[in-house]
Amino acid sequence: MFGSLDISTSALVAQRIRMDTIAGNIANAQATRREDGQPGPFKRRIAIFETGDGQGRAGVHVSRIMEDPSVGQRVYQPEHPHAIQSGPYAGYVEYPNVDEATEMVNAILASRAYEANITAKDATKSMIAAT
């Protein structure tokens, strides 16, 4: 029975990390500089799940958070302070590869998965209490 609680708990932690990642993507959807201030747009991040915990226990965990390699949108805005200064894309601003609608859908899915795991955990606790 307690293994079931561990599985639900691991899923809750994984979904919380996924939600944090999605929130960061939404917050940086218009960021035209990287975190370190270097040129280039923010890159969307994705939480990668794996089963188990590497120690033989069941459940799920976030194995890593990777950057989405896809290219964001370039918008012609020569007056923008972060516009590309020279070359074929002079005057263009590179925006992140974050689609806010997709991120909102992912946030809803993560929220529903979190709720489902709370329900499973509560059901397990009820079964433990009944025995």
Provide a role label for each language-model segment.
Residues 1-131:
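Amphipathic alpha-helical polymerization modules
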